[in-house]
C-alpha cells in the first residue's frame, strides 16, 4: 500500500537563516512543504525563494503569538504586539474570537498577495489553531476556501474537536523536535503511523541555518541538527523502503 508523507517545515519567513534552511531541505532532502508567517521579519525573502522553488508547496502559518498582527487586535495584543499570553486568555475563556477570525482573513489575503496563489493548507505558530475556541473558526475558514488544515488528531480527540471539520492528512506528528532529533526519531514517527494504519502522514520540522533571529529563539541549534538529518541520503532511502511517497497537502 502506497503511503503519502508530507514533511512540512514550519516558520518560513521567520528569518533568512530559516528560509535558507527550508529551501536546502527541500532541494536536497525530504522536505516537501512549508508554512509561512506572513508577519515574519523575512517574509518577502521567503516569497522570493518560494517563487524560485516551485517544487516546494507553501501553506500559511497562522500567527497569534509573535510580532504584530495585520489588523487591530486590542483584545489580544499588548503594546500592539502578540505574545504567549494567549494561553492564559484561552484558559480564562477570554479570547477575542471576532478579532481572531478577522486576523485570519487578513493573513490569508496577505499570503495571496505575497505568493501569488492560495496556501496549500493552514497550520499555526505554536499550534494555537488547535485551541478549542479557535479550531472551529480556522476549520470553517479552511473548508470555505477549499484548502487543507493541519489537524493534530491526538489533541483533537482529547478536546472533543470535530476531526472531519476540514480536509487533512490521516496522521500528524510533532515528535521530530528537540535536543534529540535524529534519523531514528524521524523514522519512529513513520513506523508508528504505519502501525496505526494511516495512509497519509504529516511530519512537522524546523530546519534552519542559525542567524541572529534564530539565536533569539528558545529553539535554536537543534534546527541545524534537523537540517542535517533531513538532507541525509540515508533518510530518503529509508522513507522509500517503508512504502512512502513524498507528497504535499494537495495529495490528501
Swiss-Prot record:
Signal peptide feature range: none
Organism superkingdom = Bacteria
Q: In which pathway does it act?
A: Glycan degradation; chitin degradation
The cofactor named in the record is:
Mg(2+)
Q: Could you tell me the EC number(s) of this protein?
A: 3.5.1.105
Query: Which GO molecular function annotation, any one, does this entry have?
Result: metal ion binding
Q: What is its main location?
A: cytoplasm
Annotated keywords: Carbohydrate metabolism, Chitin degradation, Cytoplasm, Hydrolase, Magnesium, Metal-binding, Polysaccharide degradation
Q: List where in the cell it is found.
A: Cytoplasm
Annotated GO CC locations? cytoplasm
Q: Does the keyword Metal-binding apply?
A: yes
Query: Which reaction is recorded as catalysed by this protein?
Result: N,N'-diacetylchitobiose + H2O = N-acetyl-beta-D-glucosaminyl-(1->4)-D-glucosamine + acetate; diacetylchitobiose-6'-phosphate + H2O = N'-monoacetylchitobiose-6'-phosphate + acetate
| InterPro entries xrefs | COD_ChbG_bac, Glyco_hydro/deAcase_b/a-brl, YdjC-like
Q: Which CDD domains match?
A: YdjC_EF3048_like
Spell out the subunit comment: Homodimer.
Which family is annotated? Belongs to the YdjC deacetylase family. ChbG subfamily.
Q: What is the annotated role of this protein in its UniProt record?
A: Involved in the degradation of chitin. ChbG is essential for growth on the acetylated chitooligosaccharides chitobiose and chitotriose but is dispensable for growth on cellobiose and chitosan dimer, the deacetylated form of chitobiose. Deacetylation of chitobiose-6-P and chitotriose-6-P is necessary for both the activation of the chb promoter by the regulatory protein ChbR and the hydrolysis of phosphorylated beta-glucosides by the phospho-beta-glucosidase ChbF.
NCBIfam families for the chain: PRK02134.1 (NF002559)
Protein name as catalogued: Chitooligosaccharide deacetylase
What are the top taxonomic ranks of the organism? Bacteria, Pseudomonadati, Pseudomonadota, Gammaproteobacteria, Enterobacterales
Amino acid at each position: 500500500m502506497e503511503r503519502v508523507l508530507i514533511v512540512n517545515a514550519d516558520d518560513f519567513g521567520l528569518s533568512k537563516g530559516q528560509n535558507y534552511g527550508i529551501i536546502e531541505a527541500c532541494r536536497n532532502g525530504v522536505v516537501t512543504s512549508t508554512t509561512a508567517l506572513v508577519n515574519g521579519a523575512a517574509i518577502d525573502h521567503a516569497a522570493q525563494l518560494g517563487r524560485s522553488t516551485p517544487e516546494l508547496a507553501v501553506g500559511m502559518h497562522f500567527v497569534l503569538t509573535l510580532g504584530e498582527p495585520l489588523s487591530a487586535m486590542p483584545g489580544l495584543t499588548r503594546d500592539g504586539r502578540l505574545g504567549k499570553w494567549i494561553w492564559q486568555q484561552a484558559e480564562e475563556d477570554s479570547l477575542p474570537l471576532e478579532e481572531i477570525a478577522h486576523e485570519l482573513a487578513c493573513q490569508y489575503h496577505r499570503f495571496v498577495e505575497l505568493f501569488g496563489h492560495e496556501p496549500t493548507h493552514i497550520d499555526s505558530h505554536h499550534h494555537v489553531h488547535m485551541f478549542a475556541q479557535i479550531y472551529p473558526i480556522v476549520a470553517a475558514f479552511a473548508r470555505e476556501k477549499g484548502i487543507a488544515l493541519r489537524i493534530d488528531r491526538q489533541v483533537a480527540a482529547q478536546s472533543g474537536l470535530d476531526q472531519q471539520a476540514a480536509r487533512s492528512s490521516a496522521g500528524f506528528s510533532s515528535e521530530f523536535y528537540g535536543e534529540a532529533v535524529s534519523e531514528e526519531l524521524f523514522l519512529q514517527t513513520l513506523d508508528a503511523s504505519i502501525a496505526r494504519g494511516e495512509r497519509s502522514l504529516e511530519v512537522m520540522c524546523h530546519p534552519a541555518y542559525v542567524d541572529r533571529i534564530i539565536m533569539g529563539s528558545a529553539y535554536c541549534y537543534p534546527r541545524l541538527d534537523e537540517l542535517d538529518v533531513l538532507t541525509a541520503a540515508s533518510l530518503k532511502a529509508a522513507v522509500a523502503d517503508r512504502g512512502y511517497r513524498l507528497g504535499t497537502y494537495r495529495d490528501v
